[in-house]
């Protein structure tokens, strides 16, 4: 959900800061962005991807040597939108630390695993789920065949990246993602999707 959508629902708290020059009001997400924290909440789509990518690029321009934190609570969504976030995470200079709070499913789990090695975390009661990409092919038989070939290529690409990010054999990733494969935070650690379960700040 974008900040604009949550504002329309009247759900975004405002933080008032005092300074020598008076008061300044921030919505909570803008205030946390100043602390280099980005939220990916809700479905992964073109709109949320554009917001996350813009924030990643902005924070890199602010300080290319300081880590960025990406907090994830997402059921997944569009593969192309998720890959735009993934590619930007790898492209920028700062390490991106990921943290699952709630659920990281499908593309959410993929982005959780995309964080910098050693800096991928989950809160204790988080859930993580991987599966193969789904498609809604329509049209003439030839169109459906083209779309089917594309989704199979995407599946192999995603499986290869997950195998590299987790250290699991490609065949295991293929088998496990054939259907919805749910994991607890501890199981996701053992699987290599994250590096550590954290219950409290250090």
UniProtKB/Swiss-Prot annotation:
Location in the cell: Cytoplasm
Gene Ontology cellular component terms for the protein in this record: cytoplasm; endopeptidase Clp complex
Record-linked PROSITE patterns: CLP_PROTEASE_HIS, CLP_PROTEASE_SER
Keyword flag NADP: no
Family: Belongs to the peptidase S14 family.
Oligomeric and partner information: Fourteen ClpP subunits assemble into 2 heptameric rings which stack back to back to give a disk-like structure with a central cavity, resembling the structure of eukaryotic proteasomes.
Record-given protein name: ATP-dependent Clp protease proteolytic subunit
Organism: Methylibium petroleiphilum (strain ATCC BAA-1232 / LMG 22953 / PM1)
